Amino acid sequence: MPALLRMTTTAQLAGHTQGGEPLRRDMTRIALAKPYWDAECEKAAVSALSSGRWVKGPQARAFGEEFANWCGAISAVPCQSGSAALWAAMRLLDIGPGDEVIVPGMTFIATATAVSLVGATPVFADIEDEYWCICPDDVESKITSKTKAVIGVHIFGQPFSPRLRTICDSHGISLIEDAAQAHGALLEGKMAGAIGDIACFSFFPSKNMAVGGEGGMVTTTRPELAERLKRLVDHGRDDTLESVELGTNLRMSEVNASVGRVQLKHINSWVSKRRENSDELNHSTKIRENSQHAWHQLCILSDEPTSVISYFDSKGIDARVHYPIPCNRHQVYSEHFQHEISLPNCDLIAHKLVAIPVHPSLSDEELQRIKDALHHSTF
């Protein structure tokens, strides 16, 4: 496994702290993430509120259409959160009791709980040692007659392996993208959102784009799923308002959709700026061939993450571990396993990945401060 920006020991960090310059009082703290908000966002939100049509209006419809056109999907439907999007994906594929869905062991817990909430079983697969996405070899070894789908996570904005598409096609199972962190990522010329059968996005404030609150988006590349997707987020109702299948209220508000439409206009330039910032920080994170990283997070491997985070904190820079506990080791799942699940890369890597700021709002001075902190805390 490559030592990506391998960090120093506690003693070395202590030496740098003692010998380095203290944080100046005029220096503002550098946030790990910073949601975008400007006069255009505010104007859109106020306009949506003033319209008196706060739900099921033109803003949400337009946002879905524009998002689908942007990412290359057949259809896109806004919803209340990334977690809601994952639940909708399960229902859209009729996944339920007796079914299995293969998910990565290292991801946000919602990837796995979406499977459990429909009564299906999440089967945890290990991650790659270089790119940290779900490992195709481990996925293929865990496919059974019960496997209904694979959820590939574009972790931190890194596109998952194109082999997942081949594996799913050869076994006749669906591929779901968890693209919560991958707005603007590209894999072999396709944008996240148009790689799998279904994709799920999050607009949580820390993501590459947001909606002024909670929000999500479900996209599909399969025309036969498009109309059903619209029904599932609105109580399973068709155009006659009859509920023809089991659904629930996952609709996005007009206010959130109006903000999302504004932010969608800027997302390409924001992702480009994230890539520029990532390059400027001169890290050695490996990027998959024939892909473009979206840099939701710039994560570095550290043998002593607590010490590194403390050092960055002393310099007024936010940093934290993503994600310290593999999903299978969370209490909600570990209590239900009758045997130890072997996910060696998850166990080795998950608690060592330190995320540092890379967002597009960073000034030149802030980028330099982050570079200096990296220089003083890496080999």
Predicted regions and their residues:
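Short beta-strand->loop structural element characteristic of the AMP-binding/adenylate-forming
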Residues: T121-Y131, R320
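N-terminal "arm"/small-domain region of PLP-dependent enzymes with the aminotransferase-like
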Residues: M7-R53, P58, K315, P357
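Conserved coil-to-alpha-helix start sites within the AMP-binding
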Residues: T107-A112
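Hydrophobic residues in well-ordered beta-strands that form the structural core
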Residues: P97, V103, F124, L175-E177, ...
